[in-house]
Amino acid sequence: MQIKLANPRGFCAGVDRAIEIVNRALEVFGPPIYVRHEVVHNKFVVEDLRARGAIFVEELDQVKDDVIVIFSAHGVSQAVRTEAAGRGLKVFDATCPLVTKVHIEVARYSRDGRECILIGHAGHPEVEGTMGQYDASNGGAIYLVEDEKDVANLQVHNPERLAFVTQTTLSMDDTSRVID
């Protein structure tokens, strides 16, 4: 059997939704619209949005108070949400619903004091946002695992209460290599 991949391929539903949120904000409110992190890893889409008035920033300290900020499909940490609220920023949350589901699970593990493994890539905006959902004050911890070597070096306190989640954009192959 021969499989042909179309090029270019489309975006996932979460990214499509995030792009639509930025487009609608530009239409309704006009530029500038600030977006925390690039809404998608696609230079053509990002440049088009930038040309229409979207301003992509890495951190909230790059924007003035009382402006519109859109959180990208990758999601953000609780600390970023708290900072935005404290500064009176008008936030539109374009976090992918699948990422939000992972955030909710991590927050629940945190509340229950369970240790949690996040399988993902260090430095990726989704991983940073997911790690930032965990509050270790209940006695648990969250660990980032990128590969099999990290698993070999991992020391958990209670393997019976260990949970794991994954970065939503990881391939099944990458994930299964770590889990197996």
From Swiss-Prot:
Keywords assigned: 4Fe-4S, Iron, Iron-sulfur, Isoprene biosynthesis, Metal-binding, Oxidoreductase
Pfam families: LYTB
UniProt keyword 4Fe-4S, yes or no: yes
Active site: 126
Reactions catalysed: isopentenyl diphosphate + 2 oxidized [2Fe-2S]-[ferredoxin] + H2O = (2E)-4-hydroxy-3-methylbut-2-enyl diphosphate + 2 reduced [2Fe-2S]-[ferredoxin] + 2 H(+); dimethylallyl diphosphate + 2 oxidized [2Fe-2S]-[ferredoxin] + H2O = (2E)-4-hydroxy-3-methylbut-2-enyl diphosphate + 2 reduced [2Fe-2S]-[ferredoxin] + 2 H(+)
CDD domains: lytB_ispH
Keyword Phosphoprotein assigned: no
Cofactor comment: Binds 1 [4Fe-4S] cluster per subunit.
Pathway(s): Isoprenoid biosynthesis; dimethylallyl diphosphate biosynthesis; dimethylallyl diphosphate from (2E)-4-hydroxy-3-methylbutenyl diphosphate: step 1/1; Isoprenoid biosynthesis; isopentenyl diphosphate biosynthesis via DXP pathway; isopentenyl diphosphate from 1-deoxy-D-xylulose 5-phosphate: step 6/6
Cofactor(s) required for function per UniProt: [4Fe-4S] cluster
GO terms of biological process kind: dimethylallyl diphosphate biosynthetic process; isopentenyl diphosphate biosynthetic process, methylerythritol 4-phosphate pathway
EC number: 1.17.7.4
Signal peptide span: none
Positions with a binding annotation for [4Fe-4S] cluster: 12, 96
Binding site for dimethylallyl diphosphate: 41, 74, 124
GO molecular function ontology, one term from the record: metal ion binding
Enzyme class: oxidoreductase
Residues bound to (2E)-4-hydroxy-3-methylbut-2-enyl diphosphate: 41, 74, 124, 168
InterPro entries reported in the protein's UniProt record: LytB/IspH
The organism's place on the tree of life at top rank: Bacteria
Amino-acid positions noted as binding isopentenyl diphosphate in the UniProt annotation, renumbered to this chain: 41, 74, 124
Entry similarity comment: Belongs to the IspH family.
PANTHER family, sorted: 4-HYDROXY-3-METHYLBUT-2-ENYL DIPHOSPHATE REDUCTASE
Functional summary from the UniProt entry: Catalyzes the conversion of 1-hydroxy-2-methyl-2-(E)-butenyl 4-diphosphate (HMBPP) into a mixture of isopentenyl diphosphate (IPP) and dimethylallyl diphosphate (DMAPP). Acts in the terminal step of the DOXP/MEP pathway for isoprenoid precursor biosynthesis.
Official protein name in the record: 4-hydroxy-3-methylbut-2-enyl diphosphate reductase
